[in-house]
From Swiss-Prot:
TRNA binds at residues 14, 64, 66, 112. Monomer. Its EC number is 3.1.1.29. This is Peptidyl-tRNA hydrolase. Hydrolyzes ribosome-free peptidyl-tRNAs (with 1 or more amino acids incorporated), which drop off the ribosome during protein synthesis, or as a result of ribosome stalling. It is an enzyme of class 3 (hydrolase). Its main location: cytoplasm. GO terms for biological process: protein quality control for misfolded or incompletely synthesized proteins; rescue of stalled ribosome. The lineage of its organism: Bacteria, Pseudomonadati, Pseudomonadota, Alphaproteobacteria, Rickettsiales. Disulfide bonds: none annotated. It comes from Wolbachia sp. subsp. Drosophila simulans (strain wRi). It catalyses: an N-acyl-L-alpha-aminoacyl-tRNA + H2O = an N-acyl-L-amino acid + a tRNA + H(+).
């Protein structure tokens, strides 16, 4: 079993923001692979289904970014999941918009959602880093990541490619995964 976590913030004011690319991507995975709609738990939304022969749980923590580790730890502990079977999809301002990197472990690089997860389960899980870039104007990074994409249509094809090919990452074929989405 694998757990795919999409990071973001709940609420309509955060929809289609840079910081919510994790939510956006797990929604696309859910749709592409025909999972049931998400159901609401105390502090997260969850659904499950199959990708090829693998049981997959998708979650969107609804505890706000800074507390994402709480629901992730609950699910990990309940299902006794190995960190090798956890993938966290998150925005990364250090990567240019549309650039993707797959990485296991490492620091949070200042990302509060990752800091929270690290504090509850450690940092040796998989990350799908979705580049959102940095502001080109005088806005702070915090204001930028909480702003909506200026042209979401430019992001949609990449999100769809990730959804279609996520099975390769789950199989451990990160090279094929990256080659098919770039």
């Amino acid at each position: 079993m694998h757990l795919i976590v999409g990071l973001g913030n709940p609420g309509s004011q955060y929809e289609l923001t840079h910081h919510n690319i994790g939510f956006i991507t797990v929604d696309a995975i859910c749709k592409y692979w025909g999972f049931q709609l998400f159901s609401k738990k105390a502090d997260y939304l969850i659904t499950s289904g199959m990708i090829n022969d693998n049981k997959i749980m998708l979650i969107k923590p609804y505890s706000f970014m800074n507390n994402s580790g709480i629901p992730v730890a609950k699910i990990r502990n309940f299902y006794k999941l190995s960190l090798d079977n956890i993938v966290v999809i998150h925005d990364d301002a250090d990567l240019e918009l549309g650039r993707i990197k797959v990485k296991k472990g490492g620091s949070s690089a200042g990302h509060n959602g990752l800091k929270s997860i690290d504090s509850f389960i450690g940092n040796d899980y998989w990350r799908l880093r979705f580049g959102v870039g940095r502001p080109e104007d005088q806005r702070s990074l915090a204001d930028y990541v909480l702003s909506k994409f200026s042209n979401f249509d430019n992001v949609t094809p990449l999100v769809e490619k990730i959804a279609k090919n996520i099975h390769l990452m789950l199989q451990g074929d990160n090279t094929a995964f990256i080659n098919l989405i770039v």
